[in-house]
Amino acid sequence: MSSGEEIKLNTSEATPCSSCGGPMSYKPSTQALVCEYCGSVKEIEQGELELKEHDFVSFMESYEKESFNTTKVVECSSCHATATVDENLKSMACPYCANPLVEQDIHEERYIKPEYVAPFAVDRNQVVGILHQWIKGLWFAPNKIKRGIFSADNLRGVYVPFWTYDMQTYTQYRGERGDAYYVTVGSGDNKRRERRVSWSRVNGTVSNFYDDVLVTGSKTLKMDLLNSISTGWDPKAVQKIKPDYLSGFITEKYQVDLKEGYDRARDIVAQYERESVKRDIGGDEQRVHNMDTELSNMTFKHILLPLYVSSFAYGSKQYTFYVNGVTGRITGERPYSAWKIAFACFIGLVILIFLIFLFKDA
């Protein structure tokens, strides 16, 4: 294989069909393995699941000292997304920009393997229908988009890496509580009620436990789009990882490592903790002058969550779609038709002028 040749991945790890020997892949609509040739179905065995949390501090100490397992990953030369290369795919393209991945981009990295996965529950055909309905419902979209510029060939199922963090907080704070009251000012026609706030100094403590603070391990995803469809991903509604669930899909390798993910989770918790302090202060308004937070019992898990990714080109720009692989919820970027917007403005102006003359004559 030349260094510039598109990757052809070995399919020997695919589960062989007991009927014809062909490769079997996971089909979300059946929640089972289905043979690509004869259609035979093999149920995926699911044992009792006990979610295991890892102590963050002790794990980081051992991770920095010991030599952890490495895995082969491939990095896209265009958008720099990374994916593991042990998927049961015949060829591979970047799930985010569709750039072909080549052999020279494969390298080995230390890798904390994910332990749990939320399997795809929405299949490819359902997603194609969801995409077409979404596109048809777009206001002021160019006609070319409405007629179906989207190609199902660009639809890719990706398991996205996530970290979940648990932590206990204990926060001492100083601030002020504001209690509103009203006074009457002025006289005669100028008499009115004005709102005033009486401030008093307060201090206290709050303690909270935060469970499964979710942090994406991807730096390639567009976070504004991802956040809008993340509802429906339950970090506890997962299964122990099995190759069967990953068969036929791309598994992205995390770019946000465990420590960076923890820092992001801590920032998220700090926002929650500030709101907790405000609730504890009470009153109508609050001022928080100082917060001193201690963290304890920090644990984590590494999980995979399902996402469909697609895009289409219009003009000189690429537009991206994301579909939640569990709920089917969709979000995406879209173009606007300048002439449709201009025509709508013109019609609105005509109606406005007509109404002005109508009421003027009346």
Regions found by a protein language model. Name each.
Residues 68, 112-313:
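Charged, low-complexity helical/coil segments in non-catalytic cytosolic or luminal regions
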Residues 305-331:
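Extended, hydrophilic extramembrane loops/domains of integral membrane proteins
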Residues 42-55, 64, 102-112:
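Short metal-binding segments enriched for Cys and/or His
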Residues 12-14, 32, 69-73, 91:
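Residues immediately within or flanking Cys/His clusters that coordinate Zn2+
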Residues 21-23, 41, 81-82, 100:
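Cys/His-rich metal-chelating microdomains
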Residues 353-362:
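Juxtamembrane boundary at the C-terminal end of a transmembrane helix
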Residues 24-27, 44-45, 85-86, 103-104:
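Short, non-ligating residues that shape and space the ligands of small metal-coordination modules
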Residues 17-20, 35-38, 76-79, 94-97:
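Short cysteine-rich clusters marking metal-coordination/redox-active sites
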